[in-house]
């Protein structure tokens, strides 16, 4: 039987756009939707080998359905401009395949597809409909199957009458009845309020159609349901009508016109223009030609099956020009099993268990040699090597870190990197292992080819990244800072920090008592007991029982968000108690109780650092997050009392940079006033208040200094008069006057802010003093809100990013000193601008001086960096 494929062009374009990474060609044209559409088309044509094909598109926003219901599809968001610009290229793609496309005023793509499907079915063809929209499933029949793209563009459910019966217990014809009862949010079809899918299916199982359900309301049990059906009668009938596909559109083509034949040259031209390297490579293999195009020639290489060898501790490998990959069951490699380690070289993948890998003398020699290691996620690999008693030497080429440096906006999961650089889709972590409670370890027959393909892909990506890194002048940033920081972090993670379980439990007992006291006080003021943690119940108490003025409403009731409570804190004495209750319960659950589960048998907590997450270059801490322990309130600070040295003859030493971002700003902006203040060690906030208010340093009041401090720290974040007035509780007029006077006083800062935004608009990025680049693709956006946000990022990123680079350089230099001298001290934690050490008391004074020197010499600025130290019997005592 001959086949015809009918493709929902709009649906698939949207699905591809949101499923694919935000790909662009070198000219800045978004290409992700076209790429995903091409993937889908290639797969469908290869899988089905149809004789006929057609793609249907929507034409215009209004259809005959709007005459019945003006709000039809009225809740849909505006199509993103990044997708709109690709629609024309999707049509060019279809031209290159020789596939016709069709659109009609007054009808939707679904109607066109439905009309052709019925014509083709009558002619005895097998009909395959490809869509990301379940509306078309109503057309399923013995000869019509719907290929529904449920996730991405190549993950498909096959809707046949049998599948629909199994999934819903309904026939395809009843799909419109189901939508008549339950509605369809995506199309703004109302349905009957309060009737969901389960109820609709139950009713249709018994009564078959919407009309029959409505005719039998008296026989249906449930008072509330009867009321809903009675009140929603007209909506149900209208909704069914809206959901029903019209199958008599006056179509443009006869079936015999829908045969297709690809045009290789058109394909090649389009793929070269859009820079679809993998498709060009495939094209060059299928149609070898001297004029295969530069991109195809450069990247063409015949696809070979990877030879998989199960290796053990005796396997000998020549590691020159190899890549290796360590695959863990979960991303938490501190506690995860290694499911396989693969070494890839020249088409062969050697797969080891963790034990066999690290007991293989050839492997250990390789790891400790100066041979370059090409990997994904060096920090993880080094941590796992250390737990096996092995260190890693030599240069390291880490595609995860490099992907992050080259495009800080790109995702760094290995499947995303492979797609971005090779245009190749491999299974995602979720597809291999599952998600959440359904996560399971598949058989080695699944794992081995998967990790082999990853290792092979890493080897192919390496030369592409090397070229890009050099182009963007970030070789030194990678070699001198980032890859060395990865080694420091792996060692810090492996070392961990001692935490007193007893101290945490004592704090938790104190918090429990305080929570009980707060609850009693809150209940007394409220006049009744209620769940304080429930926003809904709290909203009723505050805004109905106590009569406080509502500030904001949500879908479920009154908003009791922190910003709402802050506005109300002087309105009633219950508000400060509720705010304190929230603070104490959070400290108790997250830290006093929460951290206990993270303490290992050795009495330590091993946080994990994210090196490729923050767009500014800063490090973050997870599992647990030790950077977010609150320090503005005493109860939060006390959590740090539990973080202690390894023994009584040691101390916790904290050294942090003083006002590093302002010092960086003074240097980059070359502001004479700021530079002078720092050079003469004048308090920068007092100096700012003095200059802006036109008073002497001695005349600066605490409120003046507070205003100056807020502007100093907020100015390069693009703080507005509105933001400053909220922060300080002053009028917008006063805030504007202060900002204007500030910029008039610090002309270098004002000039920097203007110049850096102009640079970003011209070049599309900004960078730090150490060439860390942050792309700003939307700096010239027509949307003023988006453009202004990017302008603020442009002002801030060089400052915050340079500060991040400096602390990283300091970490590298500190770690190298520790390794070189073998001094009795350990680097334990990094928290923003602060380094935490465990130090023997006997060497504390000398060691502290050396660390301050190293940190203050990490960068050569026109303003001297300043590091300040403190120590004590715990992290709390060291501050």
What are these regions (language model features)?
Residues 1-56, 61-73, 85-88, 233, ...:
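Extended, highly charged clamp/arch subdomains and adjacent linkers
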Residues 2, 21-25, 74-250:
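Extended two-metal-dependent nuclease catalytic cores across DNA- and RNA-processing enzymes
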Residues 15-54, 70-71, 75-82, 91-94, ...:
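Conserved RNase H-like, two-metal-ion catalytic cores of nucleic-acid enzymes
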Residues 128-130, 136-173, 337, 342-346, ...:
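Charged catalytic and DNA/RNA-contacting regions of genome-maintenance
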Residues 232-354, 417, 437-634, 647-651, ...:
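Conserved "right-hand" nucleotidyltransferase catalytic core of DNA-directed polymerases
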Residues 343-347, 406-411, 415-435, 450-452, ...:
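Function-dense linear segments that define catalytic or interfacial modules
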Residues 440, 487, 494, 606-607, ...:
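Conserved catalytic core of nucleic-acid polymerases
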Residues 513-520, 524-576, 744-792, 796-798, ...:
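C-terminal polymerase-core module
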């Amino acid at each position: 039987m001959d086949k015809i494929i009918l493709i929902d062009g709009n649906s698939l374009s949207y699905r591809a756009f949101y499923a694919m990474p935000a790909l662009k060609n070198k000219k800045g044209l978004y290409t992700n939707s076209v790429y995903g559409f091409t993937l889908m088309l290639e797969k469908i044509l290869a899988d089905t080998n149809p004789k006929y094909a057609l793609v249907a598109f929507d034409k215009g926003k209004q259809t005959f359905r709007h005459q019945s219901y003006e709000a039809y599809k009225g809740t849909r968001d505006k199509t993103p401009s990044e997708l709109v610009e690709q629609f024309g290229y999707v049509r060019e793609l279809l031209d290159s395949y020789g596939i016709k496309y069709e659109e009609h005023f007054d009808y939707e793509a679904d109607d066109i597809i439905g009309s052709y499907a019925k014509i083709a079915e009558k002619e005895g063809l097998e009909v395959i409909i490809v869509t990301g929209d379940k509306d078309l499933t109503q057309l399923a029949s013995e000869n019509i199957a719907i290929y529904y793209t449920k996730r991405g563009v190549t993950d498909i459910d096959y809707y046949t009458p049998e599948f629909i019966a199994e999934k819903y217990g309904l026939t395809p014809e009843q799909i419109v009845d189901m939508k008549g009862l339950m509605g369809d949010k995506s199309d703004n079809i109302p349905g009957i309020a309060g009737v969901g899918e389960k109820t609709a299916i139950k009713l249709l199982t018994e009564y078959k159609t919407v009309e029959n359900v409505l005719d039998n309301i008296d026989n249906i049990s449930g008072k509330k349901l009867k009321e809903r059906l009675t009140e929603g009668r007209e909506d149900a009938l209208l909704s069914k009508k809206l959901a029903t596909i019209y199958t008599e559109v006056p179509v443009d083509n006869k079936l015999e016109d829908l045969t297709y034949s690809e045009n290789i040259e058109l394909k090649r031209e389009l793929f070269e223009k859009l820079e679809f390297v993998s498709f060009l490579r495939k094209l060059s293999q299928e149609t070898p030609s001297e004029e295969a195009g530069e991109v195809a020639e450069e990247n063409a290489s015949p696809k070979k099956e990877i030879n998989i060898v199960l290796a053990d501790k005796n396997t000998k490998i020549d590691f020159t020009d190899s890549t290796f990959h360590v695959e863990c069951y979960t991303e938490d490699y501190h506690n995860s099993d290694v499911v396989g380690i693969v070494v890839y070289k020249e088409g062969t993948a050697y797969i080891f268990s963790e034990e066999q890998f690290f007991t293989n003398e050839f492997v250990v020699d390789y790891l400790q040699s100066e041979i370059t290691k090409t990997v994904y996620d060096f920090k993880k690999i080094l941590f796992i090597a250390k737990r096996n008693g092995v260190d890693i030497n030599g240069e390291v080429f880490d595609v995860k870190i490099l992907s992050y440096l080259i495009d800080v906006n790109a995702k760094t999961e290995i499947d995303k990197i492979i797609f971005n650089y090779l245009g190749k889709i491999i299974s995602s972590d979720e597809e291999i292992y599952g998600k959440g409670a359904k996560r399971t370890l598949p058989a080695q027959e699944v794992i081995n080819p998967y990790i082999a393909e990853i290792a092979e892909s890493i080897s192919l990506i390496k030369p592409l990244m090397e070229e890009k890194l050099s182009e963007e002048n970030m070789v030194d940033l990678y070699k001198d800072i980032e890859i060395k920081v990865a080694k420091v972090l792996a060692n810090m993670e492996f070392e961990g920090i001692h935490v007193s379980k007893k101290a945490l439990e004592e704090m938790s007992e104190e918090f429990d008592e305080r929570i009980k006291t707060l609850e009693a006080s809150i209940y007394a003021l409220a006049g009744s007991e209620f769940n304080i943690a429930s926003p809904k119940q709290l909203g009723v108490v505050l805004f109905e029982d106590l009569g406080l003025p509502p500030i904001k409403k949500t879908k479920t009731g009154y908003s009791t968000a922190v910003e709402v409570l802050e506005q109300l804190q002087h309105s009633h004495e219950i508000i400060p108690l509720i705010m304190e209750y929230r603070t104490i319960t959070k400290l108790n659950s997250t830290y006093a109780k929460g951290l206990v589960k993270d303490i290992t048998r050795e009495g330590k907590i091993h946080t994990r650092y994210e090196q490729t997450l923050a767009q500014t270059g800063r490090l973050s801490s997870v599992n647990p997050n030790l950077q977010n322990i609150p320090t503005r309130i005493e109860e939060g600070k006390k959590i740090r009392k539990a973080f202690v040295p390894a023994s009584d003859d040691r101390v916790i030493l904290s050294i942090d940079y003083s006002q590093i971002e302002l010092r960086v700003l003074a240097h980059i902006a070359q502001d004479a006033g700021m530079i002078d203040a720092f050079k003469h060690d004048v308090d920068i906030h007092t100096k700012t208040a003095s200059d802006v208010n036109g008073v002497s340093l001695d005349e600066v009041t605490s409120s003046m200094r507070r205003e100056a401090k807020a502007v100093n720290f907020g100015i390069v974040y693009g703080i507005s008069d509105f933001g400053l007035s909220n922060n300080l509780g002053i009028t917008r007029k006063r805030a504007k006057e202060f900002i204007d006077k500030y910029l008039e006083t610090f002309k270098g800062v004002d000039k920097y802010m203007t110049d850096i935004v102009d640079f970003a608009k011209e070049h599309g990025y900004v960078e730090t003093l150490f060439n860390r680049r942050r792309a700003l693709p939307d700096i010239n956006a027509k949307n003023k809100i988006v453009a202004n946000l990017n302008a603020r990022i442009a002002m801030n990123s060089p400052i915050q990013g340079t500060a991040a680079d400096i602390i990283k350089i300091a970490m590298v230099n500190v770690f190298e000193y520790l390794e070189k001298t073998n001094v009795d001290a350990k680097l334990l934690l990094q928290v923003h601008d602060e380094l935490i050490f465990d130090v023997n008391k006997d060497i504390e004074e000398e060691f502290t001086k050396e660390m301050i020197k190293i940190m203050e010499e990490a960068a050569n600025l026109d303003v001297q960096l300043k590091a300040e130290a403190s120590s004590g019997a715990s992290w709390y005592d060291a501050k």
